[in-house]
Amino acid sequence: MKRISSARVLQLRGGQDAVRLAIEFCSDKNYIRRDIGAFILGQIKICKKCEDNVFNILNNMTLNDKSACVRATAIESTAQRCKKNPIYSPKIVEQSQITAFDKSTNVRRATAFAISVINDKATIPLLINLLKDPNGDVRNWAAFAININKYDNSDIRDCFVEMLQDKNEEVRIEAIIGLSYRKDKRVLSV
């Protein structure tokens, strides 16, 4: 709630001062401030000349911050920046090669979300790996990313068939959606 309130205040204030403040938060010693700074940089409108700098700050946080919470927020914010400017898609692919294997569940979930924002078949092996993650939220976001981007191959379909038995209801629903969309008759076994 604190993040959203902070972001709204800064969005309303807008301008370079708000961007500078968010950037300053990103290098704070306190992880909560870094998390808020990363969140704000994903949401706030920034000038074109600042985009590269902001994306690079977020990417650096994604790969190097000590706090898994901050890394996850930075990943989500890079995805938000990418939605505003798809030129950053290759950088999302590149960072995902690392973050998809992070020990933090939140980082892996954020990675699956970030991959859902881009459409790059190079991410399919990462998504298939995330479909097999021990955490249901990660599996659900990976399945969502596959479905939203309409990726299809036999490995994806086989994973979706296995996911029909998943203990997580949202994962099962994404698997049903995925198999139905692909007109795979194995969905009828549900």
Q: For each predicted feature, which ranges?
A:
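Structural detector for internal amphipathic alpha-helices that build alpha-solenoid repeat scaffolds
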Residues: 2-14, 35-49, 69-87, 106-120, ...
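Amphipathic alpha-helical scaffolding segments comprising HEAT/armadillo-like alpha-solenoid repeats
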Residues: 13-27, 47-62, 84-100, 120-132, ...
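Short inter-helical turns and helix N-cap capping residues of alpha-solenoid HEAT/ARM repeat scaffolds
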Residues: 29-30, 66-67, 103-104, 134-135, ...
